[in-house]
């Protein structure tokens, strides 16, 4: 089942005790929040389209076959170019949707998190 977001959509493909696999699609020109996660790592495998990946202080162009490993608390973002961007995301660790700290967001979703939310 697809879950729609302002930037596109994702499908949950598989879930285990300490992992989660999603297929993610960003619509042309859209991007994720600049964000990090406190309790999980992510591995991205690009399968369609192209875009720009921000990882830490680096920006890298991506295309099908590109892979990225994002560490715990590492700032990251994906941005789609003109044809969109689709990739698989494999999360390892505590895989909860609310484990997202947004630093910048095009859709007005940045906010100060209550202390309890930060301790997920």
Sequence positions of predicted segments:
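A generic "binding-loop/recognition-motif" signal
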Residues: 30, 39-40, 58, 74, ...
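Double-stranded beta-helix
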Residues: 1-5, 77, 81-120
